């Protein structure tokens, strides 16, 4: 299946549209561990995603209430797309809208006096890089860097060049999903 993943942004970082495609595998295993469904595709395990608009509205309302308590503070909101948005067939996302992109846009539209930081386009542009741990739901430091770079642009400062940063690797790095599944496909994350 081809998934549309890359997005264009306006100068302020707001999303214009999704437009690029990434090939994803249909070789999928779905299992439940500790009451949570997990989707295994190749050497990656991910949680399914579903837009629950009531929950998204509650989240945006909570941010708006917090901002109202701090009227003189500049506030930002960065919603993080998860690996399943880019690396799984869309049929494994659930809800009214199966798109995290649409869910993020919905939340951003609800915000009052809070600047959205839409890192989606930046993440989508780098899906061929190691942005997400294969055995956990978190970003790698590289994925976090790209989100930071988007934040810097929106906040009006120059980000540190990633080539000036020291990198390293903790081995072995086995995340939450490996703990749940003991999948040998994840043993080298």
Where are these regions (language model features)?
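Extracellular glycan-modifying ectodomains
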Residues: 1-189
């Amino acid at each position: 299946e081809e998934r549309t993943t890359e997005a264009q942004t306006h100068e302020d970082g707001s999303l214009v549209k999704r437009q690029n495609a990434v090939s994803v595998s249909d070789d999928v295993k779905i299992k439940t561990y500790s009451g949570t469904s997990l989707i295994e595709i190749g050497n990656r395990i991910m949680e399914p995603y579903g837009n629950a608009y009531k929950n998204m509205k509650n989240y945006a309302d909570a941010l708006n209430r917090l901002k109202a308590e701090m009227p003189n503070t500049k506030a930002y909101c960065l919603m993080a797309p998860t690996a399943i948005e880019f690396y799984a067939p869309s049929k494994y996302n659930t809800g009214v809208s199966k798109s995290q992109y649409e869910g993020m846009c919905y939340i951003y539209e609800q915000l009052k006096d809070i600047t959205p930081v839409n890192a989606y386009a930046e993440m989508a542009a780098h899906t061929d890089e190691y942005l997400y741990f294969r055995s956990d739901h978190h970003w790698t430091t590289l994925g976090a860097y790209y989100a930071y770079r988007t934040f810097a642009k929106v906040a009006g400062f120059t980000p540190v060049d990633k080539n000036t940063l020291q990198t390293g690797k903790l081995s072995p790095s086995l995340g939450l999903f490996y703990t749940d599944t003991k999948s040998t496909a994840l043993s080298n994350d």
